[in-house]
A protein has these predicted regions:
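Binuclear metal-ion centers of metallo-dependent hydrolases, dominated by the metallo-beta-lactamase
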Residues: 197-211, 224, 236, 257, ...
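A short acidic, amphipathic alpha-helical/loop segment
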Residues: 173-179, 254-258, 275-284
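Active-site environment of divalent metal-dependent phosphoester hydrolases
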Residues: 150-151, 167-171, 193-195, 221-222, ...
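Active-site metal-binding motif and surrounding structural segment of the metallo-beta-lactamase
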Residues: 146-194, 260-267
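Core dinuclear metal-dependent hydrolase active-site scaffold
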Residues: 26-156, 195-261, 274, 331-337
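N-terminal export signals
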Residues: 5-26
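Structural recognition of the beta-strand scaffold that forms the well-ordered cores
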Residues: 243-244, 265-268, 289-291
Length: 337
């Protein structure tokens, strides 16, 4: 068992979550790679707004995620990164098509990042995995919480990266090393890089014309002030504002910390206790709210990995819809804007 697996076990145990037993049982008869391929084709041919068109396909993909049971194959692939031989990778993709989906999603985001030209004030925004988003403005490209086995390939395309906290489902060592090798800023509260280390209650940065208001919150009662929240003002006559709260676990934690009450995009954890209705009533009324951290495979079980499309995220979308707010739930590789 490596360090990442050990920490994943500890996190689940601390939360009182049974590991493999927390995952719904899926029988081999329910799984077929042909069905998975057909479902994934639907995803690539639709957008996050095509909820009904995607519904059946998402159910198929979720079964394959549950079938991985502990998530260990994903964790091992994440740790090995780009060193997996091609023949071994092909076998891994065949046995666990969910990992192939994650890789195809990464390739899609990289391809579209290269091809997309942004001319106005509204950036292009993609969802990669877990809490990871990639943003391209008219002047630069950046990312938040990038965790993927191929993440190092993304570094040369970015002008900087932000990380909310030091948990292995929000960054990889290979990505940090690639950012440093490329001479790109990596902002965090755990990597000691001159100018880009943040451990203050409030800090303001500017990189490539992007203004970043950084504040602290708690991950949980055992990890106080361990989270960096980023309120990002993309350059433009009317700055496009992205607010990313990482694994902040209580809505009251963000009260009084935003410079604007109405960001354009609001990202928060869907299954850690964070109340989206409370946050939207009291603090942030975004033009689009996006719950993330569903289908997280890096933990060895427990609700974080097993949150499916028909559970917490779906409930959050209903609650926000009842409040007259717009919300969306992307899957890996989706372009959000």
């Amino acid at each position: 068992m490596n360090r990442r697996e050990f920490l994943s076990l500890g996190t689940c145990a601390a939360a009182g979550v049974c590991l493999a037993d927390a995952v719904p049982v899926v029988t081999p008869e329910e799984l077929a790679n042909a069905d998975f391929d057909a479902a994934l084709k639907v995803i690539w041919e639709t957008t996050l707004h095509d909820v009904e068109k995607r519904k059946a396909a998402l159910g198929v993909l979720q079964k394959h995620i549950y079938a991985m049971k502990t998530g260990r194959p994903f964790i091992q692939a994440l740790d090995r990164g780009l060193t997996i031989p091609s023949d071994e990778l092909a076998a891994l993709h065949a046995k666990h098509p969910v990992i192939r989906w994650a890789d195809e999603a990464f390739d899609k985001v990289v391809r579209e990042l290269k091809e997309t030209v942004v001319t106005g004030d509204v950036p292009a925004v993609w969802y990669l995995y877990n809490m990871g988003v990639v943003v391209k403005t008219k002047t630069c490209a950046f990312a938040i919480d990038i965790c993927h086995r191929k993440a190092a390939e993304l570094a040369p395309l970015l002008d900087f990266a932000l990380c909310t906290h030091a948990h292995g489902d929000h960054y990889t060592d290979a990505f940090v090393a690639a950012m440093r090798k490329a001479g790109r800023p990596f902002v965090s509260n755990f990597v000691l890089i001159w100018n880009w280390y943040c451990n203050e209650a409030v800090k303001d940065l500017e990189i490539k014309g992007v203004r970043i208001h950084v504040t602290q919150t708690d991950h949980n009662q055992y990890l106080p002030k361990s989270m960096l929240c980023y309120e990002v003002f993309c350059p433009g006559a009317k700055p496009f504002v992205i607010y990313h709260t990482g694994d902040t676990n209580r809505a009251c934690q963000i009260e009084g910390k935003l410079l604007t009450r109405e960001p354009d995009l609001f990202f928060a954890h869907c299954a850690i206790g964070f109340s989206f209705p409370e946050a939207c009533r009291n603090t942030v009324r975004a033009k689009l709210t996006v719950p993330l951290h569903h289908q997280e495979l890096g933990h060895l079980g427990g609700r974080w990995r097993c949150v499916g499309f028909h559970e917490e995220p779906a409930r959050i979308l209903r609650e926000l819809g009842d409040m007259g707010l717009k919300a969306a739930m992307p899957v890996w590789g989706d372009r959000i804007i």
